[in-house]
């Protein structure tokens, strides 16, 4: 399964909207970093490989801190973690073992190009090797039901999130008053 992060949306040339992570990527990994890609392999030896943006002091000065490979390793505990710049060269070997690639093509993120190339290579080698992925499948076939039906741990996490949201909304309401700028209310929330 290949799960790319949601794309960053721009308000104008160099002004971004607040980033909203991809729901499926966040649900399975907790990753909220733009441009991240998770590779999940199931089977006898399940593997979680994560690709994230490398640290870049110049870019971070303007757009905020990046997780980087080292922090992503400790924060998300993947089996492997690499710079997203290595995705093209590493993705094919990651996808070689299965018979299907789960990938949602709705992202205009460039990852689809690498997934398609890996699928084509596997199809070309298939007659010689007898293996490799043969089909592209929407991950919603698996994830939609998983996200819909909650276990006790997920229900407790939702209760906690609701309590935090209520407290934030109340704090925002308490900060309201004449002449209070919107950013003050947002900070209270």
Positions of the model-derived regions?
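A composition/biophysics-driven feature that prefers long, compositionally simple stretches
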Residues: 1-168
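Acidic, glycine-rich loop-and-beta core segments that form the ion-binding/anion-interacting portion
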Residues: 183-189
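Conserved short loop/turn motifs at secondary-structure junctions
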Residues: 145, 172-183
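Generic, well-ordered alpha-helical scaffold segments in large soluble proteins
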Residues: 161, 168-171, 175, 188
């Amino acid at each position: 399964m290949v799960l790319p992060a949601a794309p960053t949306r721009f308000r104008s040339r160099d002004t971004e909207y607040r980033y909203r992570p991809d729901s499926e990527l966040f649900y399975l990994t907790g990753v909220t970093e733009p441009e991240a890609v998770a590779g999940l392999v199931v089977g006898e030896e399940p593997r979680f490989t994560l690709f994230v943006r490398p640290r870049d002091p110049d870019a971070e000065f303007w757009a905020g801190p990046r997780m980087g490979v080292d922090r992503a390793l400790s924060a998300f505990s993947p089996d492997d973690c690499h710079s997203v710049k290595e995705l093209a060269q590493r993705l094919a070997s990651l996808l070689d073992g299965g018979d299907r690639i789960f990938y949602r093509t709705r992202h205009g993120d460039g990852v689809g190009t690498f997934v398609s190339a890996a699928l084509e290579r596997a199809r070309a080698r298939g007659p010689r090797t007898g293996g490799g992925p043969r089909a592209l499948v929407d991950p919603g076939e698996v994830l939609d039901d998983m996200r819909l039906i909650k276990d006790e741990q997920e229900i407790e996490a939702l209760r906690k999130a609701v309590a935090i949201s209520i407290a934030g909304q109340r704090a925002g309401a308490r900060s309201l008053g004449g002449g209070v700028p919107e950013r003050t209310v947002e900070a209270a929330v």
